[in-house]
């Protein structure tokens, strides 16, 4: 055993209440702007959007308020994988004995393709029926309290973004000699592929 090990569902529920007290109203500390930029550095032109700028020969990200931004993030935030239970349901007595859990299995984010996403199921047990919204807000609060200023790639999209996030922009991969499936920025079609990939995110145009 170890400190903090979850022993039963009741403990999950209690820890859910603690999470809400600790993180739902959390903010970045006073050295950060509301976007996670460093406010103790020289302020540059504030455009209202993230951008890049060469400062003393080095390229920096500048946040919408004009502060230098060093991205510190975690990839894959808020996701879980399914455990397959098809034809072996008898091994998962917690599901058959937990009426609420069984009902929640109708939620496709918990139960699909003959498997159970225990990550999401335990979030339901921890936070209740509004688990998706509470989990998002608790996660955002954790980031701010821990001074993590970026949702990295492959993270779940925030419904109301308050933490900067990254988007995945890909171009076609080609074979170059013995090197397979690589991106060639010197390929004549690279700019076209990049532009087309960026256009798939045009709904983010007005997001800082």
Name what the model sees in each region.
Residues 4-163, 174-207:
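Active-site-adjacent substrate/metal-binding segments within catalytic domains
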């Amino acid at each position: 055993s170890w400190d903090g090990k979850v022993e039963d569902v009741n403990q999950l529920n209690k820890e859910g209440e603690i999470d809400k007290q600790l993180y739902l109203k959390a903010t970045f500390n006073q050295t950060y702007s509301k976007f996670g930029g460093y406010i103790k550095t020289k302020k540059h032109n504030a455009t209202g959007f993230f951008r890049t700028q060469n400062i003393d020969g080095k390229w920096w990200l500048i946040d919408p308020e004009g502060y230098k931004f060093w991205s510190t993030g975690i990839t894959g935030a808020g996701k879980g994988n399914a455990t397959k239970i098809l034809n072996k349901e008898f091994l998962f007595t917690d599901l058959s004995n937990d009426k609420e859990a069984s009902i929640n299995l109708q939620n496709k984010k918990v139960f699909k393709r003959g498997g159970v996403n225990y990550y999401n199921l335990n979030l339901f047990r921890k936070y209740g029926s509004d688990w998706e919204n509470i989990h998002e807000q608790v996660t955002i609060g954790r980031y701010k309290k821990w001074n993590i200023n970026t949702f990295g790639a492959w993270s779940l999209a925030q419904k109301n973004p308050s933490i900067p996030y990254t988007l995945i922009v890909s171009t076609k991969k080609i074979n170059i000699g013995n090197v397979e499936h690589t991106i060639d920025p010197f390929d004549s079609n690279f700019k076209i592929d990049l532009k087309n990939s960026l256009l798939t995110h045009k709904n983010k145009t007005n997001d800082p």
